[in-house]
């Protein structure tokens, strides 16, 4: 801090020490420095759940997902009643080293809310929308898992929260939806939100109800072109399987590819029992103006009932 005009740079604030819950609270503003014109090197490390009034003058925000984090609550809850602004989306980081994929279900991803401010969060710095310049949704990827970080409105302004979701896009061969899972809108075995190739996944539905759809593989891409700000169009699916062996679904897909350039090959649906009240697709390219190819996909009906069409 300075009462003058000098630089306040290279400063670090840690919320929590990774070994236990942050039991304190800060009603006021946590600042990396007092000079908003130069925040170089000012870093806020969020190591567990914390409530503070607001934050300002940080170049970098680092969220460490470790065992002390309660995923039922936002890691950084901003309660002061004013917008949190002038953040740099390009300098927001998440440490996922301790994550293993635990918590990912067939009907919902692993999810943690990184930060929340009901009064608003903005990644606009002067004339720069750093969210667009940073390519939109951020990601961390391992061999089979992806973690997608995005604002609640997928924009750099007007957001109220930033969350991270985890998906398995490859090799999820034991995914199951059973009677104990009850009723949900949809379930999947392999899924990407950032255009990865979804491959080698199998979902077996043996009970319960899915009111929208069941997917062997589901492909989306929420990343953006850094220059144009437009959503990217890549992402494909191969060798995914949906097995309907009981329960009820609406539509069923070996793979649903929602990217314009994406293709689908060698995906499979088998129906041996249960009911599909809608349509069944070996694979479907569902993006408007889809340019990819759907080849070598298979549907086998051995039992059960399909009310709609089979493609």
Predicted regions and their residues:
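Extracellular/lumenal ectodomain signal focusing on beta-strand-rich modules
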Residues: 28, 54-60, 80, 86, ...
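Fold-core signature of tandem repeat domains
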Residues: 13-15, 22, 26, 30, ...
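Outer-membrane translocation/initiation segment of Type V secreted surface proteins
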Residues: 96-181, 188-190
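Well-ordered, non-membrane alpha-helical segments in soluble/globular domains
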Residues: 12-13, 75-78, 106-107, 111, ...
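Small-residue (G/S/T/A) turn/hinge positions that recur once per unit in extracellular repeat modules
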Residues: 8, 19, 24-25, 39, ...
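Tandem-repeat/low-complexity and Cys-motif detector
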Residues: 1-6, 29-39, 52, 100-104, ...
């Amino acid at each position: 801090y300075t009462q003058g005009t000098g630089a306040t740079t290279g400063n670090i604030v840690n919320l929590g020490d990774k070994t236990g819950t942050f039991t304190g609270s800060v009603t006021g503003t946590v600042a990396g420095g007092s000079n908003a014109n130069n925040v170089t090197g000012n870093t806020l490390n969020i190591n567990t759940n914390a409530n503070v009034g607001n934050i300002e003058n940080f170049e970098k925000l680092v969220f460490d997902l470790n065992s002390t984090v309660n995923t039922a609550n936002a890691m950084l809850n901003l309660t002061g009643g004013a917008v949190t602004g002038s953040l740099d989306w390009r300098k927001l980081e998440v440490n996922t080293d301790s994550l293993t994929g635990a918590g990912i279900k067939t009907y919902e991803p692993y999810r943690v809310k990184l930060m929340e401010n009901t009064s608003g969060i903005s990644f606009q710095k002067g004339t720069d929308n750093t969210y667009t310049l940073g390519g939109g949704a951020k990601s961390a990827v391992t061999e089979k898992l992806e973690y997608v970080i995005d604002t609640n409105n997928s924009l750099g302004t007007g957001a109220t929260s930033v969350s991270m979701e985890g998906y398995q896009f490859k090799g999820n061969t034991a995914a199951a939806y059973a009677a104990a899972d009850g009723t949900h809108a949809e379930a999947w075995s392999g899924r990407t939100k950032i255009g990865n190739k979804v491959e080698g996944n199998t979902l077996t539905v043996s009970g319960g109800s899915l009111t929208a759809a069941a997917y062997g593989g589901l492909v989306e891409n929420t990343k953006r072109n850094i220059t144009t700000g437009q959503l990217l169009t890549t992402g494909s699916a191969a060798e995914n399987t949906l097995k309907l062996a009981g329960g009820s679904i609406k539509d069923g897909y070996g793979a649903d590819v929602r990217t314009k350039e994406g293709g689908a090959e060698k995906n499979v649906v088998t129906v041996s029992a249960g009911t599909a009240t809608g349509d069944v697709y070996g694979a479907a390219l569902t993006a408007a103006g889809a340019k990819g190819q759907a080849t070598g996909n298979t549907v086998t009906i051995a039992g059960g009932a399909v009310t709609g069409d089979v493609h």
